[in-house]
Structures are given as C-alpha cells and as structure tokens.
C-alpha cells in the first residue's frame, strides 16, 4: 500500500495519521493515532478507518522522554506491527515566516530557515521541527513535506499585514502572518461543495478550539485574520490571552520583574481562559462550572468573537455567510448560540433544533445570512499537499527510501 504519514507534533504529544494513496490524487484515511503523555505517562492510542481500536498501550516514562522518542514509538508500531512503510511524511509546521507561501519539500537548508522562527512560535515550532530532524537523520532519502499554518494568509493585501513601527522591521519579517491556515484552507476547499455561490462570496470562518482565531475569506482566499506576528494575538484561547495592549507586557517586565523568558512562558501558558477563570483552559469544564470567574471567561470569549466578527465584516465590506469549525465551534451548541446572539446586528439567527443536532446548516429560516458548521480536517490537507508535491517530482528519477 502506497501511504502517506501525517505528523502533528506538540510539546506533550505526537498525533499521526496514515492515508493510503488510491490513484488519481485520491486519499483514504486508514489510521489515526497519537502518542501522548510524553515525559509523564506515555501512551500510544490508535484506531483504524472505521474507528476500530488498533492500539492502547502504556510505556515507561524513560522510554518516551521527548518528541523524537515518541516518533520512534509511533514509527516502530506502524512498521513492525502493521507493516506500513510510508512513501512520504507530511508535517504541520506552524510558522513559515516570510520565506514560505506554500508547502515545501524539506532538506537541511529548509530546517535551518525554519529554526529562525522558533522565537515566533515557541509553543509549537520547536516540537514541529523535532520529528523532521529525527527523520532526516535516520531516513535522509525519505521525502518530507512541511505544510505551514501561515501560508494560506499570504493572499492578504500588503497593507493588512503591516504594524505601525519603522518599516525596517517589516523588511526583517516583523509583520502580521495569521495562523490556522491549514484549517481555513480545508474549509475554503469544502465550501464550494456545500454552497457553491456562497463560496464565491464573503465568508467569516471561526476556528474555535484551544487555539482560536477567525479569518475573512473572499472568493475562497484569505484577506484578513485575527492573529498576527505570533499565535498569541486575536481571540482569547485556552492559555493564550489574544489581543493585549503591548503596555501590559512592558508592565510585566518593568513592574512585576518578569524576564523576557518568563513573560513569554506566562503569555503562552498561563493566560487566556485558564488565566481569567482560574479554573481550566477547557471550554467544556468552564461551561459546566458554577464558578463566577468561569462564567466571566466564557462571557469574555463570546464577546471577543463577536467583536472580531465586526472587524472582519468591515474588512470584507459585508458578509454572505458565517462558518464555525474546530473543537468548540464544531461541538458546543451553547457557544454557537451565544455567538449568534452577538451577531444579531448582522441579521443572524439560529435554528435551535439544527444547532443542537450539530447540523451542517444551523441558521434559522429568517436569518439574513446562512451559518454553517464545517468540521475541519487539517491532516487531510497536509496529506493532499504532500501527495501533490510527490506527483510534481514524479518525473524525476529520485529514488524514494522507504522507512524500513
């Protein structure tokens, strides 16, 4: 079976999926799994194409102490027990910086460039690069493809991505990038099959999960996003604050004595829903909690989504549809309903029955614009990009080393 392995590596887990290439560019998901609890309680879990369990096993802490070790566990299980040797590996890489506006085949030069952006995505980029380096070292001829969360937003008008600071900083790469691009790209490619006319128009997509952002699409292309230079900006998230006055950061350093490293860790790990509520970074727990600060965190999240929707509608000069996606957007009917209330000025209403069913179309019959729920599939986008790059180079005589 010709297959593509998709890897999404984080600080405490490595998520992976295997897709079979069926010809004519068609891909079928065969395996979905992850190694989580890295460095604490390592565990491999995996399921097959029909969600049948394939693995659920624990490992000693010392055997899975970092991301490369977790990759070794996943790769060894795929190779030794399922006899799967992928013809290529596609990776989610959060930050492509100014260098990359599309997926790219990875070599040591690409890795060196991507290492320059670690400071711009310290929560993600180092972990994204770890399995890439490991595979380059152990299987140097195995094609690897980097797919960037920033690339989809490179269609913005230039003026949208400046900061009002000296121009030289823009030249150096200090600019607005936007993130969750693989998710938005999937929604943009799915919309023509859901509502062809709407897909040609002005659409706001809300990617609401532990990481959260929103994107303005015009004709399926990103023209504006709530995130900027880093994935700290925009909406409040599980542990990240979203939009914040830079003066707050100066205050943390000058008045609270935080070092730059401490301030960075604080902003990425101790803020957002977790910081505001003091309860949890998980929206499900906050919705179920009776703690007043949990309610405050939910209220603030909903308010900021509504506020940013107004900004994006202005960028689009109108609105033809609104789309929810990602964990909260796909699964929380209460959050969707509350956000719809925030959008009443746009003529948005929801059908309570369809919303409770998590239907594809959840807007009411009297809504001025349709409201959709479209489950995202970033892994499929990565697999498609990886296959496309392989096909592009198929005329060459490069020998592909299989993992064996």
Swiss-Prot record:
One of its GO terms (cellular component) is cytosol. Its EC number is 2.7.2.1. It catalyses: acetate + ATP = acetyl phosphate + ADP. Keywords: ATP-binding, Cytoplasm, Kinase, Magnesium, Metal-binding, Nucleotide-binding, Transferase. Mg(2+). Can also accept Mn(2+). InterPro entries: Ac/propionate_kinase (IPR004372), Aliphatic_acid_kin_short-chain (IPR000890), Aliphatic_acid_kinase_CS (IPR023865), ATPase_NBD (IPR043129). This is Acetate kinase. It comes from Nitrobacter hamburgensis (strain DSM 10229 / NCIMB 13809 / X14). The gene is ackA.
